[in-house]
Swiss-Prot record:
Residue ranges annotated for the 2Fe-2S ferredoxin-type domain, each copy included: 32-124
Lineage of the species this protein comes from: Bacteria, Pseudomonadati, Pseudomonadota, Betaproteobacteria, Neisseriales
Start and end residues of each FAD-binding FR-type domain: 127-267
PROSITE patterns reported in the protein's UniProt record: 2FE2S_FER_2 (PS51085), FAD_FR (PS51384)
Region of interest (Catalytic), residue spans: 270-387
Catalytic activity from the UniProt record: a ubiquinone + n Na(+)(in) + NADH + H(+) = a ubiquinol + n Na(+)(out) + NAD(+)
Gene Ontology CC terms, in alphabetical order: plasma membrane
One Gene Ontology term of the molecular function aspect: 2 iron, 2 sulfur cluster binding
Organism this protein belongs to: Neisseria meningitidis serogroup B (strain ATCC BAA-335 / MC58)
Protein name stated in the entry: Na(+)-translocating NADH-quinone reductase subunit F
Amino acid sequence: MEIILGIVMFTVIVLVLALMILFAKSKLVSEGDITIKVNGEKELTMPAGGKLLGALANEGIFIPSACGGGGSCGQCRVVVKSGGGDILPTELSHISKREAREGCRLSCQVNVKTDMDIEVPEEVFGVKKWECTVISNDNKATFIKELKLAIPEGEEVPFRAGGYIQIEAPPHTVAYKDFDIPKEYHEDWDKYNLWQYVSKVDEPILRAYSMASYPEEKGIIMLNVRIATPPPRVPDAPPGQMSSYIWSLKPGDKVTISGPFGEFFAKDTDAEMVFIGGGAGMAPMRSHIFDQLKRLNSKRKITFWYGARSKREMFYVEDFDQLAAEFPNFTWHVALSDPLPEDNWDGYTGFIHNVVYENHLKNHEAPEDCEFYMCGPPIMNQSVIKMLKDLGVEDENILLDDFGG
């Protein structure tokens, strides 16, 4: 009898657990089709499942996401009027309590499980996809390549200077030993044994890059891409997925981009413009400065201050020298933080924020009236912002591209 009772109790427990699992599945696992109403007009029907960012992209609505949907950039904002569940802790570092009450969400964090009613920025309806062809992919510095893409014939990417595109990469495996690196840069690659790395990616990825080209350079998109190698203190960490993929591209390869996106745009004023950059932060600096001078024929006073380690890390030198010769309202300066003996450098040395202060802003009659545009490594951005705050520059005159470096 006890054996029979035990079997019955065991069976009951199994049935209860099975029912609990089925109930949980009905609540947690997405099934069937759902409808998403966009901006009170467009209705999208799609299978439930996945994140809202990807679901919208599949329907041709591309929400900007500099981090590729990782939840770290905070740019893929939409307003969820109904559906979507509760806001997640990962979103609250980017969304204020007031914004959360108004329905603001990060689309990369919203699960597509039920019918939803959402609002997206109107400008995203102007975003498109293009399959581009690699024209060239050349080293401009030890760890920076210039990727030049040809837009399909008859097409145009209607971007503004300072804007960015998103680039897609399929699943891939990339070995650093196969990279085409000019010999002049081998010293550092050998020193840090960078040839050892392999980047293996098992699913499609998406990342954002600021454009180095400006709107009048028709038919092409230019990017400056820094290779994201593991930090020396954590050599076993995986290398950057997208930068590794981009560095492997060769002329003739096909690449899918979407855009344009952006908010790092120049103000339409007569104020002096001070551009401060470093590393791959060169990209939006070049785009802005060329646009102001070559397309707009701006008469504003424009200075450009760029920080690099050594002469080997300087690029677009001839381009900016030519601009300075052609436009009397433009000057540019480079500061090397660690010049090599063979550089025979007699220019500015040190960190760029100190050089800008000592040689331009220290005795400037009204630095608070200038507009400052910057893009570079995080520590450079932080140092420049502190220096500007100490000078009394208001936030509205400090414009930062914080993912282009």
